[in-house]
Regions:
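A composition-driven surface/loop motif
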Residues: 2-415
Length: 415
């Protein structure tokens, strides 16, 4: 596997340091005597999450190679691109402007390991049996949605490539940017699948999938987008079962609406939300991450199980937590053994507003710390964070004006 990205490292260390300072053990809870609300906001430049090239949408039409799609074939011009029957192959670094409509054409990116390939979608409609665009080798692929254009990609239910079971597939680091629109229909399984990192820095997205809308392994960072997602399984997902230090997600300045058959927004590693509007209209679990840190934004969730779930069966309990520093979180859960906010580790609320609708509020295995912000359960303001599970982890976290209770019983929280 490639060397792991550093983009999430600084924030993960900072967040863990904050939580460690607030809760040193699973047998005690703490509460500040101050009424001040603490707000922690990640650097707005988001330099630790994105590179300058992630934002660069510029290209020179005069020097770029071109691919013009037409029916079951294409015509090409320029260096580094060739067509054979219904397959277009891009073999080296450069800029390639794609336009036209096709049915049965696949664009393959098979460049050198140090080659950066820039693809510009300029009013493209592609349907194919397997992935419409498949990047199997390159240094980095940058895909720009040309300003004002609408582009559509689809595979088929007969997609026979199990490793590239998506309409758009990348085995290498992928960036999507621009101010155009991308419609994606994942008919076999996933909408967009990336084996390593996926950074998105703009655009409008309409994604449907019979599996996951986004399926990423190591890192998924999204900013400045508008997305409408309808997935039979997970909506926005990054997951790596082999390494708990990756599987990370960062979200800022987006408007994302998700309808999902399973998790709405899922990270096996650290999930950070800085700003934006996120609506999970239907899900089994709304937000899930090894750790979940909300610094801002407006988040609305409906789920049939836990609304927010901090968990990872492969991680240490000290790595698992839910922290709310700012923003607005509204969670409604279905009937049964459900919790609006569930953490297999600690819960810390330093600021923001949490509104929960359900039979209970919090379920946690570690400790609860409440230093600022407002918490409501079924319309009633709460003065402390109370564990809903009998024999659960640490005792309640007191309100910003009060004191935490004594240590609770042995851990026994709902997974």
């Amino acid at each position: 596997m490639k060397a792991k990205k550093w983009t999430f490292l600084l924030t993960s260390i900072t967040t863990l340091a904050l939580v460690t300072a607030c809760a040193q053990s699973t047998s005690n809870t703490t509460a500040s005597n101050s009424t001040a609300t603490t707000t922690v906001t990640t650097n707005k430049k988001t330099s630790s999450y994105f590179t300058d090239k992630d934002y660069d949408t510029s290209y020179d039409e005069k020097t770029a190679a071109t691919v013009t799609l037409s029916g079951s074939t294409a015509t090409v011009s320029g260096d580094g691109v060739a067509v054979s029957g219904s397959t277009v192959t891009i073999s080296k670094s450069g800029t390639y402007v794609i336009s036209g409509q096709s049915d049965g054409v696949q664009i393959k990116i098979e460049a050198g390991s140090s080659d950066d390939v820039h693809i510009v979608l300029n009013s493209v409609t592609m349907t194919n049996t397997n992935a419409a665009i498949s990047a199997t080798s390159a240094g980095h692929v940058y895909l720009t949605l040309a300003d004002g254009t609408t582009n559509s990609l689809s595979d088929s239910a007969s997609n026979s490539d199990d490793k590239a079971d998506a309409a758009l597939f990348s085995k290498v680091d992928l960036t999507i940017n621009g101010k155009g629109t991308l419609n994606v229909d994942g008919k076999k399984n996933n909408g967009i699948k990336a084996n390593y990192t996926l950074h998105i820095t703009g655009g409008t997205y309409n994604i449907t999938a019979v599996g996951d809308a986004f399926n990423v392994n190591d890192e998924l960072n999204i900013t400045g987008t508008t997305m409408t997602i309808d997935a039979k399984e997970d909506g926005v997902k990054v997951d790596n079962d082999d390494d708990t230090s990756v599987g990370t997600m960062y979200l800022s300045d987006n408007t994302i609406t998700v309808t999902a058959g399973d998790d709405g927004i899922h990270a096996s590693g650290d999930l950070v939300i800085d700003s934006g509007t996120y609506t999970v209209k239907n899900s089994t679990e709304g937000l899930e991450g090894k750790s979940i840190t909300i610094n801002g934004g407006d988040i609305t969730i409906y789920s049939t199980d836990d609304g927010v779930n901090a968990a990872n069966k492969n991680a240490q309990q000290s790595e698992i937590f839910f922290t709310m520093n700012g923003g607005n979180l509204t969670v409604e859960v279905g009937q049964g053994d459900t919790d609006p906010i569930d953490s297999n580790g600690n819960i810390t609320v330093n600021g923001g507003t949490i509104k929960m609708t359900g039979q209970s509020g919090f379920d946690f295995d570690g400790t609860a710390t409440y230093t600022g912000g407002d918490i409501y359960l079924n319309g009633e303001k709460q003065t402390e964070i109370v564990n809903s599970m009998p024999g659960g982890g640490g005792a309640p976290g007191g309100s910003p004006q009060g004191n935490g209770g004594p240590g609770g019983g042995a851990p026994g929280g709902h997974p």
